[in-house]
């Protein structure tokens, strides 16, 4: 498929998903709502839905890529909800960037291409952004793309406004420390690892103007591969501008193929961002902040230790370095390297992932958040039919969520409970069998954990944490015995000593041959 066809298909899937969520509330999105003052707390995820409702119900704008919305009543114009466009940010060769007011309450960023020559960059920026939105709860290190619209035959992207300073400004300050930079970079690695694992994401333009540092007042936790990383640093980095980026989702790979001679491909290159980013930083600090410059040089030792490429080549020829093995390194390997070499300088608490009640409950359902904001007369009722998940544990977690959020008690009959527990026994016993397998590959004399076993382990770990949080070990001999068996499996005892290698193996199998992804 051609890239524009991929973008249209992925965008239509996104629009249909959002439309299903907001359709019950479209009749409430009227002049009275637009005239009211939005005083309730509105996070960026909810704002994304409100933006979509504004765009799809406007007379003078349309959703891009010929999305069919003929059954939606249109009743207002863009100036009612998007106003005061002002120039903003550094000048760009490709596009025009401005700040606007959304619903006269929120500052947002509006971007459009300078001319049709750069339309594909703007469209890719949008499509990569809406897919990154899917992981922002797990990885709050990317700007949220609120949506896009067509106005006067021009495509516009709208993103949240990230209120902070650029990493470039931070690096140019002599008051900035190496320890601060290390903590910022460590968070970037967490974000890139999650994005690569979930979406085969590569940014490909991660320079110091494309990272905004947001001041944070309280710690936050990122979960990754069975560990919790509680970040206590003063800044959270947010990555922006995805016009050169690549993602893979729904069986489609999105990315450009015009810059392969610079090491930038139409698909993921695992080591590109983590390496080239440090080179961008060196260019900024080498004459302004010698402490950070020396620290970054020390960090480049990671690539030297993994590839035996000389430091001279690493700092002076990034194309050759990428080709000689740097592109095949993954962010998680760098995370492990920093934990091993620089942990005293990290303002991050690292411990085993636990399944708390809050984590079980998840975030308040979008239906209830929209209802609270729009259905002021409390007319709409949620459609909550009983849902039996696959097995007793998952069903119990689901029923707890339903009761907590909707105050609706889901009662299981005794025969249903027995049947669901039998399903769990089959699932969980099969997991134990798979995690006890010792697979010795050709040419090796030691067993190695496979990619499939790694994935099954984290599935089993989720069950284990749910069982402990729900205290099922106290009421069921089966769950008590299974938990003990799980902790003793060969994979459970060896997973973290082999995790770097398994993740790297898995990541490299996701990288197609350069140039074979897209049809131009």
UniProtKB/Swiss-Prot annotation:
* Membrane-crossing residue ranges in chain numbering: none
The EC class name is transferase
The GO annotation for biological process reads: intracellular signal transduction
Q: Which residues form the active site?
A: 205
Task: Give binding positions for ATP.
Answer: 88-96, 111
Coiled-coil ranges from the UniProt annotation: 416-442
Tell me the superkingdom of the source.
Viruses
PANTHER family named in the record? INTERLEUKIN-1 RECEPTOR-ASSOCIATED KINASE, SERINE_THREONINE-PROTEIN KINASE HASPIN
Identification of the protein by name: Probable kinase 098L
- Organism, by scientific name, is Invertebrate iridescent virus 3 (IIV-3)
